Amino acid sequence: MKQRTIKRPVEAIGIGLHKGVPVKLRLEPMAEDSGIVFYRSDKGVSIPLSPDYVVDTKMATVIGNEGVMVSTIEHLMSAIYAFGIDNLRIIVDNDEVPIMDGSAISFVMMIEEAGIKELEAPKKFIKITKEVEIKDGDKFAKLKPNEKISFDFEINFDHPVIGNQKYMFNFSTKNYIEEIARARTFGFLKEVQYLRSIGLALGGSLENAIVLDDKKILNDSLRFEDEFVRHKILDAIGDMSLLGGNFIGSYEAFASGHHLNHLLTKELVAQEAFEIVTFEKEGEKAVAKAFS
């Protein structure tokens, strides 16, 4: 299997979730072994995709370099991971990736419009070689060895619409588009009101998030009955992309979020619990077929 980029540049305009201002997003092809790099065109600063450049994980995954940041990268990175893209320049003219409809489907459509280009160099996978786990009370996130890529997530909210939800996702690009990409981010009305009081979530609305009061959702409907846990998987895929490539293994979590996911990527690297592998022949392994 070869490294991938996109065939041609593609652009979109949306608003940032927290500042509520317009953001122009542009994806550009890059050569093999370039990796994925964010570029703030308004500041002239590049930020490589790496756990070492994560600067905040409270409300979203935020990366930064030289005091310049790009926030809410996880939905875009989730879609990029799903297509197995290794080399890409991501240009934004503000400090947030646009939220679009709160899911990853707009980014999936951008990538499909741009097309996938295979390069000459072999694709490098991050193969998990031993179990790594991060805990915080009853919350946890772990990566385990497996010959395939899978995500197993459970959440438990004291809310009549959410409650306990579990989802086991066997990864492939096709499955991602059908099962995960359309799942939207969600938040509680009382939290949104507080965030706005401190100047955050100014771009949030029923157009780009599921909003819940104490008893129900305020949106017209859900896209999936278990849309909440599916979105947590969408986020986890985006957060795991900060490893710098597609991993081979199983991700399992209970009530994890951006912070635990980030600590998990850092711990995996610290323990050297992985090896870099390449598959020279297409279809040689089940994991290569997942990206076909």
From Swiss-Prot:
SUPFAM superfamilies: Ribosomal protein S5 domain 2-like. It catalyses: a UDP-3-O-[(3R)-3-hydroxyacyl]-N-acetyl-alpha-D-glucosamine + H2O = a UDP-3-O-[(3R)-3-hydroxyacyl]-alpha-D-glucosamine + acetate. Zn(2+) binds at residues 75, 231, 235. GO terms for cellular component: membrane. GO terms for biological process: lipid A biosynthetic process. GO terms for molecular function: metal ion binding; UDP-3-O-acyl-N-acetylglucosamine deacetylase activity. Its cofactor is Zn(2+). Pathway: Glycolipid biosynthesis; lipid IV(A) biosynthesis; lipid IV(A) from (3R)-3-hydroxytetradecanoyl-[acyl-carrier-protein] and UDP-N-acetyl-alpha-D-glucosamine: step 2/6. Its EC number is 3.5.1.108. Keywords: Hydrolase, Lipid A biosynthesis, Lipid biosynthesis, Lipid metabolism, Metal-binding, Zinc. InterPro entries: Ribosomal_Su5_D2-typ_SF (IPR020568), UDP-acyl_GlcNac_deAcase (IPR004463), UDP-acyl_GlcNac_deAcase_C (IPR011334), UDP-acyl_N-AcGlcN_deAcase_N (IPR015870). Pfam families: LpxC. The active site is at residue 258. Belongs to the LpxC family. Catalyzes the hydrolysis of UDP-3-O-myristoyl-N-acetylglucosamine to form UDP-3-O-myristoylglucosamine and acetate, the committed step in lipid A biosynthesis. HAMAP family: LpxC. This is UDP-3-O-acyl-N-acetylglucosamine deacetylase. It comes from Nautilia profundicola (strain ATCC BAA-1463 / DSM 18972 / AmH). The gene is lpxC.
